[in-house]
Amino acid sequence: FYGQWKKTGFGEKGWAKVISNGKMGDGPWGNVFAGKAKGGDAVSSLKPASDEIKLAKGFEAELLYTVPKKEQGSWVSICVDDKGRLITSDQGGRGLYRIDVSQEEAKVEKLQVDITSAQGLLHAFGSLWVNVNGKGAGVYRFTDTNGDGSYDKKESIKGLNGGGEHGPHALVLGPDGKHIYVVGGNMTKLPQMDRSRPPTNWGEDHLLKRLPDARGHARTIRAPGGWIARFDKDGKNWETIAMGFRNTYDMAFNIDGELFAYDSDMEWDAGTPWYRPTRFYHVTSGADFGWRTGTGKWPQWYP
């Protein structure tokens, strides 16, 4: 019946019975209109990982390490290096950490690099690639030139203009093993590219006047909004793959090499006609997923 309710003379005959999934405010989301979400029961103490995670048959979850927030911050990105160790980054100014989980007890060391606030980490092509969000935003490459376990060479690959929760985000190795994919939120200005798959003549024209966000969020941000691009193993030949995202944080390829991403809309717009619920995107080449500021975003039924 999708779309038929707009037609003259439409009747409700044939509609299925309404199914209730719970009252507004039930977990896990909480009441989004109450000012403070309280969905579900608060976790008063740390539980084993298996008690917190739903696992498929045959899988197990193990708690490896509990991050002391006061000393090591809030870890917001993670990757695996060429020796199977984890590398993570604090969201703020507490730096990068390397975690060896090969023994019964995890060994954690702070990396001696002058960088922090990485929301994208990837070890590929013999180097650590870092996407910094905030001061000094941009993509960097760190290399251990003498094999002593320390990253002694730092290179700025491309500076980015953006930061905060909608700034530069994930780095992912492409399925061809030759390219690195990078994503930027809608407050990350699209940098100079060598080529673009989406047409670059995007516009902001509307038949009806747009209503900007009443609280001022992203009022001055215009197309292309959030974007996904890629570059080669030397950090060159940047190419825009898709655009029109709001704040996609991460992405992944399936076994067939198809790219998928996850996005969300402004949470305080929930219940309005222009709200677009959280969703997965099948990121096809050259796509524009239609985020525009305020009420100017493209409706879900646009092709």
Where are these regions (language model features)?
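Accessory carbohydrate-binding/adhesion or oligomerization-edge regions at the termini
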Residues: 1-39
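Beta-propeller domains with acidic blade repeats across secreted/periplasmic ectodomains
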Residues: 39-303
